[in-house]
Curated annotation (Swiss-Prot):
HAMAP family per UniProt: Ycf3
Source species: Chlorella vulgaris (Green alga)
UniProt key word Ion transport: no
Keyword Repeat: yes
Name of this chain's protein: Photosystem I assembly protein Ycf3
Length: 167
């Protein structure tokens, strides 16, 4: 049984009902409806920390979805799960894929920056100052682009950029 049919969470259930109504009235193909259903179930599983189930749903949605913009959000969410699981290399791959399809995705740019900043901190702790500088510069590049797209977001990143002279 699909997650959307067994969900006890009121907000998720409300979202599911509204999404089902929209899918019925909007002119979409059955394949697009299936892709959205898998995506929705993936989001629900992800919000409950059921990452393996979420990934299964996202991969199925990715298989069915043909629209590049919609695929970018599926790829972004897969990246989020890999970030949560500590697999930063894999997460970066999915964030980059999301940006290839949708260059105006500031949250992917931000998450890439966060990973590079984290790696910069690790390099600094290992006394690899040159590598840390390169990683921090890379993080700054991605944060500047994210901030350009969403100027009122990422306040901590803006402060870090100013404090480090990278803004």
């Amino acid at each position: 049984m699909p997650r959307s049919q067994r969900n006890d969470n009121f907000i998720d259930k409300t979202f599911t009902v509204i999404a089902d109504i929209l899918l019925k009235i909007l002119p979409t193909s059955n394949k697009e409806k299936q892709a959205f259903s898998y995506y929705r179930d993936g989001m629900s599983a992800q919000s409950e920390g059921e990452y393996a189930e979420a990934l299964q749903n996202y991969y199925e949605a990715l298989r069915l979805e043909t629209d590049a913009y919609d695929r970018s959000y599926i790829l972004y969410n897969i990246g989020l799960i890999h970030t949560s699981n500590g697999d930063h290399a894999r997460a970066l791959d999915y964030y980059y894929q999301a940006l290839e399809r949708n260059p105006s995705l500031p949250q992917a740019l931000n998450n890439i920056a966060v990973i590079y900043h984290y790696r910069g901190e690790q390099a600094l702790e290992s006394s690899q100052t040159e590598i840390s500088k390169l990683l921090f510069d890379k993080a700054a590049d991605y944060w500047r682009e994210a901030i350009r797209l969403a100027p009122t977001n990422y306040i901590e990143a803006q402060n870090w950029l100013k404090m480090t002279g990278r803004f």
